[in-house]
Regions:
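Anionic-ligand binding patches
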Residues: 1-167
Length: 167
């Protein structure tokens, strides 16, 4: 559904503006909750945009879930559309797990204080950060950008766009 939602958003803006458009749809998918909150991430608590209530509801839903079963991933679909209707949608993910409590930091929004990205490790040619069991909210913007679902989706779009455009 993320891809479908991204396409709907892109089509709407492209039709209104007459210009090529990029739109995304993203969310958090928790294994123990059968993928919820998923496409309803922004309104998981029942209304749109209440990060604190969404976090509280997620923590309550995960209260009895043991450490080894708290897998989750952020998912992003990015859609590029041309005024003629041709479009390209690319997906990105960041795997991780849900913390037992908020791991607040100086950055982030939404579920960032609850999401611990999988350790990316650090190698000589690897520019991704070692996440060291830090939440998204505890990573600097540059660290988060290097591993994020949106960053991964945009990198894939950048890779596929030239052939899509016939360049």
């Amino acid at each position: 559904l993320f891809a479908e939602n991204a396409l709907i958003k892109a089509e709407t803006i492209c039709k209104a503006s007459g210009l090529p458009t990029i739109a995304d749809d993203s969310g958090l998918c928790v294994d123990a909750l059968d993928g919820a909150p998923g496409v309803y991430s922004a309104r998981y608590c029942g209304h749109h945009g209440d990060d604190e209530a969404n976090n509280e509801k997620l923590l309550a839903a995960m209260q009895a879930v043991p450490a080894g079963q708290r897998g989750a991933k952020f998912v992003s679909a990015v859609c590029f559309i041309l005024p003629d209707g041709r479009h390209l949608t690319c997906m990105g993910e960041c795997p991780g797990s849900i913390a037992f409590t908020r791991l607040c930091g100086d950055y982030g929004f939404g579920y960032d204080p609850l999401f611990i990205p999988a350790d990316c490790g650090v190698g000589k040619t690897d520019k991704r950060p070692n996440t060291e069991n830090r939440s998204y909210a505890q990573l600097t913007p540059d660290e988060k950008d290097a591993i994020s679902h949106r960053g991964n989706a945009l990198a894939e779009l950048e890779k596929q766009l030239p052939s899509f455009l016939g360049e």
